[in-house]
């Protein structure tokens, strides 16, 4: 750009232009530094513009990653705290030169940190040139493959698909590829055959896949970095990013994908808006070392240091134009985008005012954007709230909403990311029309020439402050939602723009906004510019507006009852919510998390050895280990803690029928079980019988009374109405009382004989029957083996404390005690010595920008630059993948109707259809006439038990009742709970001395007593004889404890001791004798409100009350709770035969019935036209055994045909890989014989207390038990403390409408009405019948407060009050004493069978059952397919007959036979073509040609020969004169017609091949297309349509869509006897191919690598084109069955299916990696036909 463009009208360079030139020089320096800073490592994610929150800085350049506010993220890419999330639709591709420098050479290290979400075979990244892969890392399910070009790969057994975080390093050093894991502690290496090639500069780098159509990596990538050395691989953890370390630390908690900005460090004095990253959580903050580049300290610059309070304007841009912003309360931040992305970012203009003119849109809305030293807190916005961006119209305009006072809306940010496409198109049209003048082009060159942002001033470098998109400061005006379409603009010329810049020092008062100017004229379209560089992807759009609320959902199922429902399982993570509006400015953040732990302190002095601790308690018994092999009988062990209840196992096979046991005695009625949790809904049961007419539905809500209409004439009786829709099922009522036995019904009419019903579905498994009666005692069996060792018993109660032991030895010195408390502050010490001279301080900050210097002289005009060279042609794109198989063709035209079939047999009656849905609610009928009063009805049956009424009011105080008669002595009550410790009793009288006790047993040696006082001197004994002086003896041990002395006299009574603590609870004592009847005690004080008592017996029918006032009709009540299932009523009388119902809908398909009897062969019918493809019919008649067909495409199911007679056996079908649904559960086998009783095992230890089991299933409702005997009156309990107010429960779902309530009691008396006019005295009426009880009246208004009454007498015990709110759960009580067994209740009624439950989840695999008895002989199986031809084995039994050989080649042509006799007259030929009119003969018209004779023997004649014969005959006819005889003309006409007939048949045979050797087809599908009546069989084909001599015979499977199946030369050989040319043509004419290979093996497991022993590889298969089918690859064959792993000395087989969309890969020509056979190992390979379609 020449400098002349910067001159102003005054001939000088403006300060702004001079600043821009200076900043460009700085930008070039930054670019040069960044290129040399790449040697430390290339961050691939940063280069792709996907830098996350964690950024490490290199050199002196502050790298700020492109986040959601500066660079648009590609589709399928999300940013999170831990890195970049790639989804399945993410596709990121970039030229390699934009990612890696061209000078990158080996060795190099790839540092990777990732977490995978989905298991697949995707590439993490790939580098490819055209269709050649140069380098890539592929993640397989259990492997990691490094591709290094030249089809060289190195595989590592490393699994990264486990949803965990992995970090590893891969080094490439010439031909050695290594992988380092666990921070370099482990590594694996592999070598390639040649050195790894260097990268081509024209290559393409792809992240997450190898191309767009292959599998995509789905997961999070926190680091992908390439280092140009291998030194960092051994300690690669030192180079991991912080976000990788944080992700590894938070392995347990996974964050959902979300888009976030960068974490930012903020100064303490800067208020941050709510929601700003860094204020949410302490994890989002950076330390100064992380957020500042090298060379800067962490000190902050106070606001006062800015001269005159000026803040540095901050300009940001990511494209060709810049929106200038000013920050008044924040520190500006710098930005450095990717050096290779081609972006253009504007530079910072400090301390200059830029005043932009108003931009006018078609809505006549104005906005003035300015950058100044001081900006108002709010920008002015017009009344419509729409904002037009500054410099709108340039490419890639980026606006940021961070500047204080510039309310830039989200709609205007990120380069119009949120305007629709029409708006952008209109904007481009307007710009194209308006940017033609030289001034605007010059301005665009100025704005487009700035390359990178440079930090100007120290405050720019010290602080980074990034904001997420959509956040605003509280003093800014929030954006108005809406769109804008700028149409016409009023642009300044370049000189005017600089004039505005020069006038910034002239500060006048701010004027009022002027009126909008008129739209400018349309500019001349400018010349089309050169194609610019490809821009980086735009930012993500803001979330859309929330949608309207959806329709109300269906009513949910009723909740569980009773009790509060259990907490549901945690739901799946919800979708990412919309970005909320910016919140208000938050307060100062909380104190940050504590810093990293300090360095490890020095080791303290070792403490003294401590005393030996007391032995610990025995640990808990561990869980039971897996069941091992039965070992020898071990020592009696302790019982393990009971394990958790396992899941229900799968239902076992039906057991062998046992001997039916004798009927056992009737068991006792069990106790009613607890109410279990409500089980899941059961499966739909089998259709029940048609029920009777249901009860009428509930009455609807009474509508408002309409005006009374005129009384119409009585209408004629209407016709019989249709039966109403069935009402909803009524709520189950309470259990009714036992009804009176009904009278026997009248004998019904004999019903019609019904059709034979189809076998019903298998019934629900019945409940286990009652245990049978004990059988007769059997003979004494042999003694069984000793039983298993019993479980150890529970740990016993701790015994009593033993006697005090002897005094122990002196213990070791204890450890040092804890440090003492902090002492008081000591006196101030003396002044210490002077310290050393400090190091030199850091250089001071860079000074502020000086005053602008004088304008420089005008520069010289620069030379015109040369035109750039045309770029090289880009690399050729990769070849596309094979297209998807075409959809199935349209359905063919309908064929002509076939002949009428014979009358079918009468079908089986279908299942009764389900009851129809209730019809719509009919319109409200007209009010009927008031009927006459009916006669009083008879008393109705006993009503159902009503709901519990409200608690009655407290009754009046009752008088003292008379003393009752002495009651019978009650039964002994249960032992009471232990009472509290009583107060110390009075000192008792000293008792008499007791009897002498029995001598106690010798106790243990007690502790040595203290020496007693010196005893009295004893009486001197007789002198003994003088003994010999013996040697001094050793010191003897202490003697044994002496026997206890006689009991001494009783001492004086001691003083009363202190009250002891309550002892442990004693065991329940023996029941005492019944005491005497005590006297009646005094009447106690009235007790507290008791719990509500049980409902009493229903009272007798009361007298009818007086009729109350008519109450208002109540609203429909809520439905009551579901009642208890009542006892099934008695069977009613047989109803009359109803009318014939309507034909119900088609019932569900029943289970397959037994095969019918073989019918007689009917006459052969005429051949019908080809109909539409129907469903798979029943088994057809037995045909010749053909080649197994493959599974065809899924067709639309046709209507089910009538069941035909049992056909003969058809072709054996191919083994299907899809398992059928599991069969119904088998019937329970009969009870087996009772086993012999084993020997009594040794008594085991008492087991531990068992873990409380899971709550059992809900038992049947037991009958109410008989009332128990009345217990004795318990002691008065203390009044409990009032429990805390319970938490308010979650409001339950609204219940169903309840049964109409019982008519209420008469309401209170209403207010006295005004006195009415005296009426005429009426005649005395007859006494009326007592009326029914009226509804609850309307409550009257409250009356006046009455005078206080006299104090009433003391009230009696009030009625039970309502139950209080549930108190807080009390502490767990001690285990209660075992209660006495209750009175056995009566046997309850048998409950109604419950609904069939849902199908249970498949249980765990059960333990293998015991070996069953030998089963009965099974039915004769179907004949299996013909076995393969065996190898030549040892001379033994003659093997089975081999397969039929192929049809031999055609033999040589035989000699010409003798002329046979004259054949009979042939059939009439087809009508020939009409010939041309011949020349008129001299003898008049010739007679008509005679009928053609019998056709001669067919000869091989082609079209050329026929035409040649025709031409020769015509030429001969022309040579003859017209005087030929009539016979000559007739003979010529005959030859012509014969030739034409042959030509017609020959053309027809070419168009419609017959599949014969003389007229072969290309492939079998041609026969299916040309002929509509073909059947499966052998046909001849010629794929290249050459000479018919190279045609070959194939099997055409038209049932599978026209497959062409080639049989191998031999079953045991992989050869097919077809030339390569024909096979290539067959491949070209086909779209898919299948091939099945079976390996018969004897003790040779060789398919899966998991079964392979040793270093041998699993077997693989070589296809026709040389590709290899093997395990864990994309060409892995489908294993239909694999029994070769069974090595039991019998033949087994492994069956493989090869199905591919690339026919060139089949047939399989070789089986590789077959192991060497041992002495007892054999195998052979069986090849089935290969079929092409």
UniProtKB/Swiss-Prot annotation:
- Domain Fibrillar collagen NC1 positions: 1534-1733
The residue ranges of the Laminin G-like domain are 102-229
Q: Where is this gene product found?
A: Secreted, Extracellular space, Extracellular matrix
Q: Oxidoreductase: is it a keyword of this entry?
A: no
Q: Gene name on record? A: Col24a1
- Similarity annotation: Belongs to the fibrillar collagen family.
Q: Where is the composition biased (Gly residues)?
A: 1045-1054, 1084-1093, 1352-1361
Polar residues composition bias: residue spans? 312-324
Q: In which broad location class does this protein mainly occur, judging by the first location in its UniProt entry?
A: secreted
The entry's note on the tissues where this protein occurs is: Expressed in skeleton. Found at ossification centers of the craniofacial, axial and appendicular skeleton. Also expressed in retina and to a lower extent in cornea, skin and tendon.
Keywords assigned: Collagen, Extracellular matrix, Glycoprotein, Repeat, Secreted, Signal
Q: Which residues form the signal peptide?
A: 1-35
Q: Where is the composition biased (Basic and acidic residues)?
A: 1237-1246
Q: Which GO terms describe its molecular function?
A: extracellular matrix structural constituent
Biased composition, Low complexity: where in the chain? Answer: 573-599, 699-708, 923-944, 1056-1074, 1175-1205, 1323-1339, 1371-1386, 1434-1444
Q: Would the keyword Mitochondrion turn up in this protein's UniProt record?
A: no
Its name, as the record gives it, is: Collagen alpha-1(XXIV) chain
**Domain Collagen-like, chain residue ranges per copy:** 506-561, 577-636, 679-738, 742-801, 802-861, 886-945, 946-1005, 1006-1065, 1072-1131, 1135-1189, 1191-1215, 1220-1279, 1316-1375, 1376-1435, 1439-1498
Q: One GO cellular component from the entry?
A: collagen trimer
According to the record, glycans are attached at 157, 366, 396, 448
Species, as recorded: Mus musculus (Mouse)
What is known about what this protein does? Involved in osteoblast differentiation.
Note down the stretches annotated as region Disordered.
Answer: 257-335, 505-1499
Q: For this chain's UniProt record, which GO biological process terms are given? A: hematopoietic progenitor cell differentiation
Which Pfam family, any one, appears in the UniProt record? COLFI
Start-end of Pro residues biased regions: 512-524, 776-789, 912-921, 1485-1495
Q: Which SMART domains match?
A: COLFI, TSPN
């Amino acid at each position: 750009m020449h400098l002349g463009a910067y001159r102003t009208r005054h001939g000088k360079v403006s300060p702004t232009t001079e600043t821009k030139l200076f900043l460009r020089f700085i930008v070039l320096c930054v670019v040069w530094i960044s290129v040399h800073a790449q040697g430390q490592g290339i961050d691939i994610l940063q280069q792709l513009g996907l830098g996350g929150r964690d950024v490490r800085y290199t050199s002196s350049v502050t790298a700020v990653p492109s986040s959601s506010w500066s660079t648009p993220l590609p589709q399928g890419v999300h940013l999170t705290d831990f890195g970049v999330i790639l989804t399945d639709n993410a596709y990121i591709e970039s030229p390699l030169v934009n990612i890696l420098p061209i000078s990158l050479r080996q060795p190099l290290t790839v540092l990777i940190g990732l977490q995978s979400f989905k298991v697949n075979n995707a590439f993490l990244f790939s580098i490819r040139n055209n269709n050649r892969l140069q380098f890539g890392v592929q993640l397989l399910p259990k492997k990691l493959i490094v591709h290094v070009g030249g089809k060289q790969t190195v595989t590592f057994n490393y699994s990264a698909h486990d949803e965990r975080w992995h970090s590893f390093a891969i080094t490439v050093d010439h031909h050695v590829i290594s992988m380092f894991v666990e921070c370099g502690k482990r590594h694996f290496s592999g070598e390639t055959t040649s050195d790894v090639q260097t990268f081509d500069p024209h290559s393409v780098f792809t992240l997450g896949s190898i191309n767009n159509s292959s599998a995509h990596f789905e997961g999070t990538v926190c680091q992908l970095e390439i280092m140009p050395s291998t030194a960092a691989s051994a300690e690669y953890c030192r180079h991991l990013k912080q976000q990788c370390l944080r992700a590894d630390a938070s392995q347990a908690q996974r964050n959902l994908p979300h888009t976030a900005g960068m974490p930012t460090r903020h100064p303490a004095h800067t208020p941050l808006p709510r929601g700003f990253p860094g204020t949410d959580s302490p994890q989002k903050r950076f330390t100064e070392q992380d957020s500042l580049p090298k060379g800067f300290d962490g000190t902050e610059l106070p606001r006062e240091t800015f001269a005159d309070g000026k803040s540095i304007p901050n300009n940001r841009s990511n494209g060709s134009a810049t929106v200038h912003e000013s920050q008044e309360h924040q520190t500006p931040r710098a930005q450095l985008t990717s050096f290779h992305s081609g972006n253009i970012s504007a530079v910072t203009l400090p301390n200059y005012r830029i005043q932009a003119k108003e931009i006018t849109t078609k809505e006549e809305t104005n906005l003035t954007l300015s950058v100044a030293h001081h900006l108002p807190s709010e920008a002015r916005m017009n009344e419509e709230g729409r904002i037009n961006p500054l410099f709108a119209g340039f490419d890639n305009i980026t606006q940021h909403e961070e500047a204080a006072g510039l309310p830039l809306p989200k709609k205007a940010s990120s380069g119009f990311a949120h305007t629709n496409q029409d708006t952008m198109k209109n904007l481009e049209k307007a710009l194209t029309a308006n940017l033609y003048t030289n001034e605007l082009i010059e301005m665009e060159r100025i704005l487009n020439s700035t390359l990178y942002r440079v930090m100007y001033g120290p405050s720019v470098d010290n602080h980074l402050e990034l904001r997420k998109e959509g956040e605003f400061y509280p003093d800014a005006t929030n954006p108005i939602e809406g769109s804008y379409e700028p149409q016409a603009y009023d642009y300044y010329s370049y000189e005017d723009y600089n004039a505005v810049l020069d006038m910034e020092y002239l500060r006048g008062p701010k004027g009022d906004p002027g009126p909008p100017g008129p739209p400018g004229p349309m500019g001349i379209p400018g010349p089309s510019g050169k194609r610019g560089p490809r821009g980086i992807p735009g930012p993500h759009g803001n979330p859309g507006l929330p949608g309207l609320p959806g329709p109300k959902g269906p009513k949910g199922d009723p909740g569980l009852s009773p009790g509060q429902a259990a907490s549901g399982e945690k739901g799946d993570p919800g979708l990412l919510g919309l970005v909320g509006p910016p919140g208000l400015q938050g307060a100062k953040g909380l104190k940050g998390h504590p810093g990293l732990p300090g360095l490890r302190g020095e080791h303290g002095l070792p403490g003294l050895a401590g005393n030996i601790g007391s032995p610990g308690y025995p640990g808990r018994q561990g869980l039971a280990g897996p069941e091992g092999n039965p070992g020898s009988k071990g020592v009696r062990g302790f019982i393990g803690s009971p394990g958790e209840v396992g899941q229900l196992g799968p239902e076992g096979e039906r057991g062998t029928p046992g001997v039916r046991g004798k009927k056992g005695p009737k068991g006792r009625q069990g106790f009613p079980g607890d109410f279990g949790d409500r089980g899941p809904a059961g499966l739909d049961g089998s259709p029940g019988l048609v029920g009777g007419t249901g009860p009428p539905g509930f009455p609807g809500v009474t509508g408002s009374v309409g005006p009374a209409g005129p009384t119409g004439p009585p209408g004629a009786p209407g016709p019989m109405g249709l039966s109403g829709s069935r009402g909803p099922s009524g709520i189950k009522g309470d259990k009714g009382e036992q009804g009176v036995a009904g009278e026997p019904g009248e004998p019904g009419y004999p019903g019609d004989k019904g059709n034979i019903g189809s076998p019903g579905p298998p019934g629900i498994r019945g409940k286990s029957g009652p245990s049978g009666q004990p059988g007769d005692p059997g003979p004494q069996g042999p003694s069984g083996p000793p039983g298993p060792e019993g479980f150890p018993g529970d740990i016993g109660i701790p015994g009593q404390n033993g006697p005090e032991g002897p005094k122990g030895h002196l213990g070791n010195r204890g450890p040092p005690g804890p440090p003492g408390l902090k002492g008081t502050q000591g006196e101030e010490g003396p002044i210490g010595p002077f310290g050393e001279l400090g190091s030199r301080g850091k250089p001071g900050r860079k000074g502020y920008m000086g005053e602008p210097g004088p304008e420089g002289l005008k520069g010289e005009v620069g030379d015109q630059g040369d035109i750039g060279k045309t770029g090289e042609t880009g690399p050729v794109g990769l070849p596309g993948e094979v297209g998807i198989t075409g959809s199935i063709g349209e359905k063919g035209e309908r064929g002509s109707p076939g002949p009428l079939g014979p009358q079918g047999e009468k079908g089986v009656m279908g299942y009764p259809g389900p009851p129809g849905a209730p019809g719509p609610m009919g319109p409200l009928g007209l009010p009927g006439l008031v009927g006459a009063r009916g006669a009083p009805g008879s008393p109705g049956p006993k009503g159902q038990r009503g709901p519990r009424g409200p608690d009655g009011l407290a009754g009046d105080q009752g008088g003292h009742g008379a003393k009752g008669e002495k009651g019978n002595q009650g039964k002994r009550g249960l032992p009471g709970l232990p009472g509290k410790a009583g107060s110390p009793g009075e000192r008792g009288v000293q008792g008499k001395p007791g009897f002498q006790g029995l001598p106690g047993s010798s106790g243990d040696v007690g502790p040595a007593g203290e020496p007693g006082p010196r005893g009295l001197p004893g009486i001197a004994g007789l002198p003994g004889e003088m003994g010999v002086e013996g040697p001094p003896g050793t010191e003897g041990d202490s003697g044994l404890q002496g026997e206890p002395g006689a009991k001494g006299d009783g001492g004086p009574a001691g003083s009363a001791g202190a009250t002891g603590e309550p002892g442990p609870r004693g065991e329940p004592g023996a029941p005492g004798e019944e005491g005497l009847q005590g006297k009646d005690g005094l009447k106690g004080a009235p007790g507290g409100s008791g719990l509500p008592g049980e409902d009493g017996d229903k009272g007798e029918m009361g007298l009818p009350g007086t009729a109350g006032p008519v109450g208002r009709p109540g609203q429909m009540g809520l439905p009551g709770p579901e009642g208890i299932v009542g006892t099934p009523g008695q069977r009613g009388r047989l109803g009359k035969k109803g009318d014939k119902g309507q034909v119900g809908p088609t019932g569900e398909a029943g289970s397959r019935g037994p095969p019918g009897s073989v019918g007689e062969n009917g006459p052969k019918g005429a051949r019908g036209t080809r109909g539409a493809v129907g469903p798979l019919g029943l088994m057809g008649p037995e045909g010749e055994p053909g080649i197994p067909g493959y599974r065809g495409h899924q067709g639309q199911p046709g209507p089910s045909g009538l069941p035909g007679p049992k056909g003969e056996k058809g072709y054996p079908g191919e083994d299907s890989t899809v398992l059928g649904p599991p069969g119904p559960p088998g019937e329970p086998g009969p009870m087996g014989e009772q086993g012999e009783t084993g020997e009594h095992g040794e008594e085991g230890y008492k087991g531990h207390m068992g873990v409380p089991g899971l709550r059992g299933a809900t038992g049947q409702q037991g009958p109410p038990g008989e009332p128990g005997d009345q217990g004795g009156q318990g002691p008065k309990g203390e009044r409990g403390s009032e429990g805390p107010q319970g938490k308010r429960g979650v409001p339950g779902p609204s219940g169903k409408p309840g049964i109409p309530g019982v008519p209420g009691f008469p309401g209170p008396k209403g207010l006295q009405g005004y006195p009415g006019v005296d009426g005429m005295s009426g005649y005395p009426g007859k006494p009326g019948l007592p009326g029914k009880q009226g509804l609850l009246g309307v409550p009257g208004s409250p009356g006046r407060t009455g005078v206080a009454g006299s104090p009433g007498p003391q009230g009696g015990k009030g009625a039970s009050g309502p139950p209080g709110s549930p108190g807080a759960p009390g502490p767990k009580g001690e285990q209660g004493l075992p209660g006495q067994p209750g009175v056995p209740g009566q046997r309850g009624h048998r409950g109604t069978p419950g609904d069939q439950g849902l199908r249970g989840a498949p249980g765990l695999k059960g333990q293998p059952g015991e070996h069953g008895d030998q089963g009965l002989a099974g039915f004769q199986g179907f004949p299996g397919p013909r076995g393969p031809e065996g190898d030549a084995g040892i001379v033994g039994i003659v093997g089975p007959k081999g397969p039929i050989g192929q049809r031999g080649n055609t033999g040589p042509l035989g000699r010409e036979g003798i002329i046979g006799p004259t054949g009979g007259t042939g059939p009439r030929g087809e009508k020939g073509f009409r010939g041309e009119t011949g020349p008129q003969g001299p003898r008049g018209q010739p007679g008509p040609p005679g009928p053609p004779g019998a056709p001669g023997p067919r000869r091989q004649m082609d079209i050329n020969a026929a035409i040649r014969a025709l031409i020769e005959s015509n030429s001969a006819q022309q040579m003859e004169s017209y005087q030929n005889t009539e016979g000559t003309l007739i003979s010529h006409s005959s030859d012509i017609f014969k030739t034409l007939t042959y030509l017609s048949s020959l053309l027809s045979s070419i168009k419609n091949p017959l599949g014969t050797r003389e007229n072969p087809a290309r492939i079998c599908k041609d026969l299916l297309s040309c002929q509509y009546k073909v059947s499966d069989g052998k046909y001849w084909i010629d794929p290249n349509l050459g000479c018919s001599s190279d045609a070959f015979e194939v099997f055409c499977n038209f049932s599978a869509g026209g497959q062409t199946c080639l049989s191998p030369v031999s079953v045991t050989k992989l050869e097919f006897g077809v030339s390569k040319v024909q096979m290539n043509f067959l491949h070209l004419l086909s779209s898919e191919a299948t091939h099945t290979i079976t390996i018969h093996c004897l003790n040779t497991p060789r398919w899966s690598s998991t079964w392979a022993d040793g270093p041998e590889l699993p077997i693989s298969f070589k296809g026709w084109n040389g590709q290899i089918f093997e395990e864990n690859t994309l060409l892995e064959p489908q294993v239909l069955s694999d029994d070769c792993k069974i090595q039991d000395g019998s033949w087994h087989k492994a069956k493989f299916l090869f199905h591919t969309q690339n026919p060139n890969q089949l047939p399989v020509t070789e089986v590789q990696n077959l192991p060497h056979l041992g002495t007892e190992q054999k195998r052979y390979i069986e090849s089935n036909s290969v079929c092409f379609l």
